[in-house]
């Protein structure tokens, strides 16, 4: 699993999730139509979010109510991010949080190998898969 977009905010509002979709749009190849998974937060059920997903040709997937296991891969990444980076530093501003997230995502995608991806990084794994298509 590769992290493609991440935004930070003081509150989980529409500006946050729509900003994440804007960032994601700049990184997706035109031919890709991935599944985007979320919990059942009100911002993910809003008409503006769902319209934006449709406009970007993304497939929406939502966890069932009260079932954290539906998003196990995403929860695993959040746990790793907290354990490997965020719990080890003291951050004083939203800008510092955003910078730490960007640094971690680069490391996670390009340097940190995963045994579940044949002991390679998410970017190398994706590139190998795409080369076979």
Give the predicted meaning of each segment.
Residues 1-133:
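Charged DNA-binding/catalytic regions of mobile-element recombinases
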């Amino acid at each position: 699993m590769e992290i493609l977009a991440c935004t930070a905010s003081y509150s989980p509002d529409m500006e946050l999730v729509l900003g994440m979709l804007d960032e994601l749009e700049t990184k997706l190849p035109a031919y890709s139509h991935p599944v985007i998974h979320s919990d059942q937060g009100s911002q993910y059920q809003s008409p503006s979010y769902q319209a934006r997903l449709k406009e970007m040709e993304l497939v929406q997937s939502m966890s069932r109510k009260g079932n954290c296991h539906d998003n196990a891969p995403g929860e695993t990444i959040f746990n790793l991010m907290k354990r490997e980076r965020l719990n080890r530093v003291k951050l004083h501003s939203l800008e510092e949080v955003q910078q730490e997230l960007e640094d971690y995502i680069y490391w996670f995608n390009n340097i940190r190998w995963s045994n579940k991806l044949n002991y390679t990084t998410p970017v190398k794994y994706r590139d190998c898969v795409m080369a076979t298509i």
